[in-house]
Every structure is written in structure tokens, then in C-alpha cells.
Amino acid sequence: MSEQPPFVHLHLHSQYSLLDGAIRIGDLVKKAKEYAMPAVAVTDHGNMFGAMEFYLKCQGSGVKPIIGAEVYVAPGSRFSKEANSASGEGSAFHLILLCENNVGYKNLSRLVSTGYKEGFYYKPRIDKEVLAAHSEGLICLSACLKGEVAWLCGRNRVEEAVATARWFSELFPERYYIELQENTLPEQTVANERLLEVARELSLPLVATNDCHYLNKADAHAHEILLCIQTGKTMNDENRMRFSADEFYMKSPQEMAAAFHYAPEALANTVRIAERCNLEFDFKTYHFPRFEPPPGESLDEMLERQAHEGLSERLVTIRAKYPDLTPEQEKGYFDRLRIELDCIKQMGFPGYFLIVADFINWAKDHGIPVGPGRGSAAGSLVAYAIRITDLDPLPYNLLFERFLNPERISMPDIDVDFCQDRREEVIHYVTEKYGRDKVCQIITFGTMAARGVIRDVGRALDMAYGDVDRIAKLVPEVLGISLEEALKQEPKMNELAAGDPRVKELLDTALCLEGLARHASTHAAGVVVAPDVLEEFCPVYKDQKSGSLTTQYSMKYVEKIGLVKFDFLGLKNLTVIDNAVKLVRAGKLPEFDITRLRDDDEESYKLLQAGNTTGVFQLESSGMKELLTKLKPSCFEDIIAVCALYRPGPLGSGMVDDFIERKHGRKKVVYDLPQLEPILKDTYGVIVYQEQVMQIARTLAGYSLGGADLLRRAMGKKDPAEMAKQRDIFLEGAKKNSIDTKKAEGIFDLMAKFAEYGFNKSHSAAYALVAYQTAYLKAHHPVEFLAALLTEDMGNTDKVIKNIADCREMGIEVLPPDINASDKSFRVLGNSIRFGFGAIKNVGESAILAILEARQEGPFKDIYEFCERVDLR
């Protein structure tokens, strides 16, 4: 058996060379392993989108990841937006850069970020000035035929090519290589001869690459279609952008050795370069934003002070709500606070809590509605004390350890709901406070999903729209269904493919391209705040249409490198509540405070029991209305349960019916052990919440709440090995507590079953509070509530119609638009609502402002006066 030739691919485009590269990262690593390559590089066009995914997928594979990029270098200044005929496309040359080490990574990160932020002209371009400032730690290859040296060689401008290569070799001493490719293109053969001349004259080392754009030779056709999708052309277009050969695949070392038989050193140098590239990331360090405490106070001390002061203030409200609160119960609050603070400090997260509290309290101080909580953070008393959340976790048995587990160190994740209209103001505040160069949103990638890829490929093949549309519509309407699964479920698709070679080509190509990244966009909520310039940690992308900056790594990988992200979510219901409260205060109750409601209001529960919940947060769908009329919630715990139960899992399992039957006494509530009653009493003996699983583990088997959270996670993931381990721990613990083994086994199995459907009670409770507030407003202040709801839904005619129907059902008259009485929004007039101009189709903002401005001088007497006084432009 002959020895494998030395070779590593150093010029390769993954799917993150959007609509140009067709290599999936996982497939790349698998193929490199199959070829027994010691390393492989990813060099996407002008970006590092896939760098972190690639690096992590290589871990444990035996393949060393080499992070790089094929950057675009402007022929002149990166700021010049004029085409330059000196370059092939008129705007940029190509250049391969590979990271040797962490310094190189930071420099490459800065370079590709600069391309988007400063040099974008069709492509994200850098220039030689910025390259010279950030060349350390990078190995440079002269690139393909579009590289400057190769381009000059192809035009027989060898002296200029030598001068250019000399410049690069001086900038990258011992780190600059002349790149050769063998792809059967005649122009490549010509360029190679002259590239060899340049290398000889300057004594520069050679390197062999293949500019891989797809994995296998057989993928060349699919790749051609991918290029058509990118350029909006069809395969029938002779002038379309295309690769003139089918050689740009991930060749084996043997194929590369055969192609470069004349330059064995070019092959050997690929391995030498790979040996020089030793970039390592620290995934154990969190990079917290710099939050400055007052002089003489540490972050720990600041959080301690704010939490104690905040809880003392909160207790004033708690005592008013629960007049029979005992000193022992009050002490319980401070004991819980102590436990949480110790855990937060021990885990090193005080700064995180202070940062979140700072921007939430800034929002509240500026009249921006903020939700009472979201996710597991609602289980934290510290979060409640420092006004991150507005739900007291103790009365509802919400667990801090579900949010932050001392036995499993991971970054806390506090998601925050803001008024949809003013969310951007909070992001702007954070950006200004921490620095524009340290804050940005997070990228996300749209992929070619089953129906979409059929349509894309159909267009590229120039097939009739009707035919393609008919095939695309055969894909079953199942969220996230793959084309492969669709072909199994819908035999008609296979029949069409068998009877028509064009349809077969369409589906075969669609299968090949499905799932590839199609475009970059911005994550709806995620914002990253770094301690230093963001490019130190992660490259930045700029959307050229909106101008917004995002990380080049998606959410998962941003968190993996230790950057701290915050989720700023927009929730329209908070705007509705805020506007309704303002209307109530402007009318009959100037002192009305929505945050001080008792949770046992009879009228609110009557409204819920009747299913009169149009406009009520989380409870307005027809299915939810049906559930409410059956369940008939009579306490706040029931609303929490409804929010948790209305999901496909519980509804399909029979546990919802069981819950209802037990609540109404039609089925007896039985507890296998008396210790379960305090835990399951509020849910009538049914395990509804993840927190209940944790409490059972603690009570019966002596788990710490941190350990119980690990058990909950294991049950959720259904890892057989971990489940077996946890089962032994549970049974052993139960035995120590004198619990019968058979009963303990039965309870463990019951927990495992319900863990599949169990919901996070903290999240349910926080959202139940918003639901209750909207129900209260609708029950007690229906005119104000529905006016606020109609105003918020003005842009959606269907919702306006539905809300007006709801007004009529509640006996509230909606008065028609009146040129002398309507405002932009819906107005409250006694027990009536005046229709707002903003909900009238084709009446724009400027027209409304012109009418309202003219009306300040008095009402309009007739149409003629209206036309005379209102600016008709």
C-alpha cells in the first residue's frame, strides 16, 4: 500500500460563502477525516460566518481546524466606490489569509469587519493600508486567478506581478506563498507558468490549492444551479456566471498529488502551513461588559446593597397584599435572598444582574413599559428585589435553581419584554452606555427550506412557474419538514419525478442544496455587549440596507466564545396595557396602578371562565377559549397552569382532561405518598411543571435543588445512560428516607413521563400575570382596554374588525370616523369608542397630521372648507 501524499486543503468555501460555496461544515470534517488529512481550512468569501461552527465541529475529530478567509482587496482605497478597470470585476482582488495564532485571529476578525463597515462596494473590501496594519499572525496565499499576482500574470504583466508579490512577501515575511491551482482552465495554465517565474525570481515558496466550492465532483451541476440562484439567472442564459470546469471539489490527496506532480514542494508546504496554524480558543472565560460600580464599592457589594434595599421596599407592597404575613415568613424572604446572593457571587455573576437591572430601570424611568418577567429568571428573588422582574416568586414556589444552578456553571439568561414601539430606545441606551464599538445585534441565517429550495431551483432551471408551484405545494405543511421526509410522505412527488426527467432534475438538485445558508439577517432579540471592541472576540457584519451591525457568529457560537448576550423582546400587549392604564387614569381613576392588583378579583375570573378573552394576552385563541370554559380558572394558580398546559404535548397526552376532571371533583385526587401533596396540591395531583419534578426529587430522595435541576435536564434529554445513573441516585435517596422501593420506582417513572411535557413554571407565572392584568382591564375598564387594543391593532384590518365585534358583544358602541372628532388613535367617549384615522386604509401619517393641525383652528364646516384649510399634498 503506497504512502499517502502530504496534502491539506487550504482554500475552501463552505456554505457560508453564501450562494457560492456548497460545502456543509459537518460534511467537510467527515470528508477530511475520510481522507486522513491532519487539518483543513475554511476560507469563505470576505467573512468568517462559519469559523466557530467549523472550529467546534473539528474538536475530537482528529482534524485540525484552520480558520481563514478569502478577503477582497480594493485596488485603491477601500473608501473609493468607483470601479477600477485594473481588477477583474472592477472592484476587488482576492487574497487568502489563514490564522496562525490568536493574534492572527484578532487581526483577521478586524479585517473582515472593516470590509463590511468601511469598504463595502458590491463586496466587503479591505485595502493594502488596513492589511498592513493587521498582518501579524496571518499566513497569506496569493489566491486564485482573481488574486492580484495571478491576475497580472494572466495578462503577461510579470514585472508588475513580481513587484506586487515582493510587497506582500515583505508584509508577510516567511508567511507569504504563491498559490497554484490545477483546474483544466487554459487561463490557469498560462497564469501558473508565470506564477512559477515570480516565485523563482523572489525565492518564494509555492502552495497547491483547489479552491473547493463543493464536496464531490458529482455536485458540480447543483453548484452551477446555486450560482444561478445567487445571480438571478437561469441555466439557459449563456452569459450567466459559471465555473468553466467541474474540478472545484474537495479532491483527495492522491488526486492533488497527480495534478501537481511537477511541484511536490507545493503539496508539502500545505502540511507545513497546517503545522504552523495553532489557533486555540478559551471557551471557559466569560467576557462581561464593564459595569462601573460607585467609587469604593465592588460589584458584589453593590448587588448586595441594592438587593437588600430593594427587598425592603418590596416587602411594603407584600405586607399590604398579605396582611397576615408573619415575621417568620418575612425572615424566609431574607433567608432566600441570602442563598441567592451567595450563589450569584460564587458563580461570578453580580455584574450581569446589575447590567440587566440598569437598563430595565432606565426603561421604567423613561416610561417604557417592561414585562413582569420571562423565562426562568422570574424564579429569582434577587431579580424581583432589584426590579428586573415584578413577580414575587415565593407565593408560587418558583425555584431559583431552575434559573441558576450552582452545580452546573452556565451563564444566566434573562430575557426581557419591552413595549414593542420603544424597544429600540433601550437598545440605543445600552449602545451609548457601553460604546458603539462594543454593542451589536446577532446574526442569523436563512436557509433553503423544502418548499423554498424547490422554487429556487425551479426558477434557475427556467421551468414554468405553475409546474414548480404545484410541486412545491405537494410538500406537506409540517413545520421544519425536510425534502427527504416530504418525498416519503407524498408519493405524488416521486411519481412526477419518475415520469418527467425535468422534475427529477429539480428534486435531485433541491435535495442537494436543501438546508444551505441562503442569506444573512438579524436575530429578532439578541444583543451582544462586549468589554472591549467587539472585533477582539468576534468579527462584525454590516447589513448594507439597514446599516445595522451584527456579529458574524450566530447565537450559539457567540455564547460559546463567552460573549454576554441579552434578549430585548418586543411585546405589543405591554403597549396595550400601558395605553389602557393611561386612559383609565385620564378618566375615572387618576391613581390607578396595574402593578398593585390583588390576584383574586372575582370579575376577572368570571370573564376568563366565560372565555371572553379576545385581546387577553396568551388566552385569546379559539382553542384556549374552549380550554378556559372547560377548566373555569378560579385562582391565579389556575391561570399559571392554563399557560403551561395549552401545548401540543399535554393536550395530546390526556393530562389536560385529567387536570380538569380532578379540579371539578369528577375524579379523585390521589397522592402516592403524603409528601407529594404540598408539591402537587395546586395542580390537583398532576405533575405540570419542571419545578415540581425538582421538588419531588428534593423531598423524596434528598437531592439538592441544583442536583434536582440536573435530574430534570436528564429527563428532558432522555439520555439512557444519564437516566440510569439518576434512577440509581433517586432510589438510593428514597431508600434513605424510608420510602418503599416499588413506590419510589413508580414515582420516578411518573416523573420521567411528565418531564417530557413539564413546563417552566417561572415563565408560566410571569406570563400569567400579564394575562391576568389584561383580563382585569377588560373586566373592569373594557372601553379603555378595547380602545387601546384597537389602536395597537390599527394596521391590521382583520384584527380591527374582530375587536369591533368584541366591542359590540360587550355593549360598547364604536362610533364611525368623524373629520371633526376623530384622532389618529381610537378615543374613549364615555361608554363609546370613536374610530381612529390611523385605522382607515390609505390614509397616511402625513395626511392625518395635516388634518389634526388644520383642525386646531376650529372644526371644518363643509368639504370645501376642509379642502381649503388642509394641505392636500
Positions of predicted regions on the chain:
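Domain-core and long-helix interface of multi-subunit machines
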Residues: 2-42, 46-61, 110, 114-219, ...
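Short, structured patches in soluble enzyme cores that scaffold and shape functional sites
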Residues: 99, 112, 142-144, 180-182, ...
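Covalent nucleotidyltransferase
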Residues: 80, 89-96, 102-115, 623, ...
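Solvent-exposed alpha-helices and their adjacent loops that cap or buttress functional pockets
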Residues: 88-90, 131-134, 519-521
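Short, hinge-like loop/turn segments at secondary-structure boundaries
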Residues: 57-61, 82-86, 114, 195-196, ...
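Non-cysteine beta-strand/loop elements that form the S-adenosyl-L-methionine
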Residues: 69, 140-143, 816
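Phosphate/diphosphate-binding loops
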Residues: 64-100, 196-208, 212-219, 223-279, ...
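Noncatalytic, beta-rich nucleic-acid-contacting surfaces in large DNA/RNA-processing enzymes
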Residues: 38-42, 51, 58-61, 214, ...
